[in-house]
Amino acid sequence: MVKPPAGGNEGGRGKPARLKTAYGRTPSQQAWLERQINDPFSAKARALGYRSRAAFKISEIDDKFHFFSKGAKVIDLGCAPGGWLQIAVERGVTTLAGIDLLPVDPVAPAHLLEMDFTADGAPEKLLELLGGEPDLVMSDMAPNTVGHRETDHLRIVGLIEIAAEFAIDVLKPGGAFVAKAFQGGETAEIIGKLKRHFDKVQHFKPKASRQDSSEVFLVATGFKGR
């Protein structure tokens, strides 16, 4: 963890902290580190023991849509580093399973699978860990970007589509689907399919999402069945 320079931003006030440029660090990496240090949600996440600022995003989404409850079964796609799972457990969910390519430190009582969700057999293994149909499928999956706008867009759309197809295949009636998206990052075809299977489909941008980011969340509620 990178610590801000002593006295550089005491009490969250004053001038933003600046880091000395480390050898081998690119300008974009430097900017990202400085943004993390000065971001109030990142600082709050560290103070409260959450693994990422994304915990506040799912908190706001749940405050509005009320997904998490003691009896709910929840699947988290792209669950690293575990912030969404932390909030789900904190709000009473006891049956949940997460999957990610990256290793995730335990978040009891969640079952964790270190695997590519798009790999053969991954969805089946995840459902087996959960022990039944989920009430909520949530996806924070994001592709590795290559810097080519059209290619990155197609990768984003592809992951949203995969997550949506999975949700439609496995959800209980009345269930819900939440996925990270980007403005203009999903096709009319995906939205149309979700509208055929859910009572309501909408976009939601939490305050914890950076305002200069195109990040939004696709929220589909009232699953009508396959």
Swiss-Prot record:
Q: Enumerate the Pfam families for this protein.
A: FtsJ
Q: Where is the active site?
A: 180 (proton acceptor)
Q: Name one GO molecular function term.
A: rRNA (uridine-2'-O-)-methyltransferase activity
Report the GO terms under cellular component: cytoplasm
Q: Which reaction does it catalyse?
A: uridine(2552) in 23S rRNA + S-adenosyl-L-methionine = 2'-O-methyluridine(2552) in 23S rRNA + S-adenosyl-L-homocysteine + H(+)
Q: Which family does it belong to?
A: Belongs to the class I-like SAM-binding methyltransferase superfamily. RNA methyltransferase RlmE family.
UniProt subcellular location: Cytoplasm
Q: What class of enzyme is it?
A: transferase
Instruction: Cite the binding residues for S-adenosyl-L-methionine.
Output: 82, 84, 100, 116, 140
Name this protein carries in UniProt: Ribosomal RNA large subunit methyltransferase E
Where is the segment annotated Disordered? 1-25
Q: What EC number(s) does its UniProt record assign? A: 2.1.1.166
Keyword S-adenosyl-L-methionine tagged: yes
Quick check: keyword Ribonucleoprotein in the entry?
no
* UniProt function note: Specifically methylates the uridine in position 2552 of 23S rRNA at the 2'-O position of the ribose in the fully assembled 50S ribosomal subunit.
Per UniProt, which keywords does this protein have? Cytoplasm, Methyltransferase, rRNA processing, S-adenosyl-L-methionine, Transferase
Q: What is its main location?
A: cytoplasm
Q: From what organism does this protein derive?
A: Caulobacter vibrioides (strain ATCC 19089 / CIP 103742 / CB 15)
